């Protein structure tokens, strides 16, 4: 009886691993975006926590205030990465039934 349960559990673990790999690939194709400065800076990140694009509108370019542009870029990047991490956590939670598995994501 114990062997049957162990076999069933191992199959479930293997299925979860396959599902996780599929989800990781899928998340790499999904994106989130964030803006700063009223849309002057837009950053897009994917579900691998990678920044895939940064757009800066011409009106954001002020040679007299480079620091403001740097702050807007930093704010938009950080927010995009946070949104990407939230998306990853939400999707992984669905997959694992909200189990907290250390080091998983």
UniProtKB/Swiss-Prot annotation:
The Gene Ontology terms for molecular function here are: DNA binding
Matching InterPro entries:
YbaB-like_sf (IPR036894), YbaB/EbfC (IPR004401)
Its signal peptide is: none
Q: What is its main location?
A: cytoplasm
One Pfam entry name: YbaB_DNA_bd
Q: Which domain of life is it from?
A: Bacteria
Keywords associated with the record = Cytoplasm, DNA-binding
GO CC annotations? bacterial nucleoid; cytosol
Q: Which SUPFAM superfamilies does the protein's record reference? A: YbaB-like
Classification via Gene3D superfamilies = Nucleoid-associated protein YbaB-like domain
State its location(s). Cytoplasm, Nucleoid
What binding partners and quaternary form does the record give? Homodimer.
Name the NCBIfam families on file: DNA_YbaB_EbfC
Question: What HAMAP family does this protein map onto?
Answer: DNA_YbaB_EbfC
Per the entry, what this protein does is:
Binds to DNA and alters its conformation. May be involved in regulation of gene expression, nucleoid organization and DNA protection.
The record's family statement is: Belongs to the YbaB/EbfC family.
Q: What is this protein called?
A: Nucleoid-associated protein PTH_0052
Q: Which organism is it from?
A: Pelotomaculum thermopropionicum (strain DSM 13744 / JCM 10971 / SI)
